[in-house]
Amino acid sequence: MACGATLKRTLDFDPLLSPASPKRRRCAPLSAPASAAASPAAATAAAAASAAAASPQKYLRMEPSPFGDVSSRLTTEQILYNIKQEYKRMQKRRHLEASFQQTDPGCSSDSQPHAFLISGPASPGTSSATSSPLKKEQPLFTLRQVGMICERLLKEREEKVREEYEEILNTKLAEQYDAFVKFTHDQIMRRYGEQPASYVS
């Protein structure tokens, strides 16, 4: 009978022959509910930790800058064309102001000869000293030099705007990141803060 009982042992007696202790197996069901109850908190805490590990710079690296694909909007030819058009408008404005000063009866006597010299042609008897002062002035820069100056100013302005945009974007992302971390922490404390801490094996 003893041999038959020995041969008819079920699998329940196998842990006795295994190197693992049976106490460890009996404690496993008791710790399972605690670990299951703490699993949502652990998952939320892990999500918060992973979110806290990220920084606004990570989002900036993931999302390309909106200035990356923007090429130069104004070419050198367009800048030169705009300068020519602006120069023509300035000349027309000066002629209009000169004609208004010439036809205005309330203008002073010393401004009338100046207006005449600007708008009207010089009389044959006048000397070269009484010619228009605009004809005496020599241009300091050529048209190409003015275009290069304008192009450089536009590039400097574009870089300044880009730096200001990146700075504002970093500030806004940092504020959103802090608000998200605070919101996640408040949610964790509100949901699991009142529960007693349990040992998780």
UniProtKB/Swiss-Prot annotation:
Its main location: nucleus. The modification Phosphoserine is found at S18, S21, S55. A motif (Nuclear localization signal) lies at residues 22-27. Highly expressed in testis, cerebrum and cerebellum, and barely detectable in liver, heart, spleen and muscle. Also highly expressed in various tumor cells from hepatoma, glioblastoma and pheochromocytoma. It comes from the Eukaryota. Polyubiquitinated. Polyubiquitination is dependent of UBR5 that extends pre-ubiquitinated AKIRIN2. Disulfide bonds: none annotated. Homodimer. Interacts with IPO9; the interaction is direct. Associates with 20S and 26S proteasomes. Interacts with SMARCD1; promoting SWI/SNF complex recruitment. Interacts with NFKBIZ. Interacts with YWHAB. This is Akirin-2. The gene is Akirin2.
